[in-house]
């Protein structure tokens, strides 16, 4: 039996460990867009196949 707890397609336990590589701040998971959002850096890192791509060059800039 699989004990993995998931939010969308990312493991919640992994989400608790991840921080923004630029600011070292917390990340929020956006299930609709399948992204990890760093509000402090104003970047959204993509999650592809359940794997967070934590490269600033791959992140989408958040503009208001």
From Swiss-Prot:
A Gene Ontology cellular component where this protein is annotated is:
cytosol
Write down the superkingdom of origin: Bacteria
Q: Tell me, what's a Pfam family for it?
A: Trm112p
Family per record:
Belongs to the UPF0434 family.
The protein's name in its UniProt record: UPF0434 protein BOV_A0835
- Source species: Brucella ovis (strain ATCC 25840 / 63/290 / NCTC 10512)
């Amino acid at each position: 039996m699989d004990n993995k707890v998931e939010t969308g397609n990312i493991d919640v336990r992994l989400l608790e460990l991840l921080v923004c590589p630029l600011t070292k701040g917390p990340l929020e998971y956006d299930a609709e867009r399948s992204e990890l959002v760093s509000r402090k850096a104003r970047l959204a890192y993509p999650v592809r196949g359940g794997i967070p791509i934590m490269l600033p060059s791959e992140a989408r800039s958040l503009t208001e």
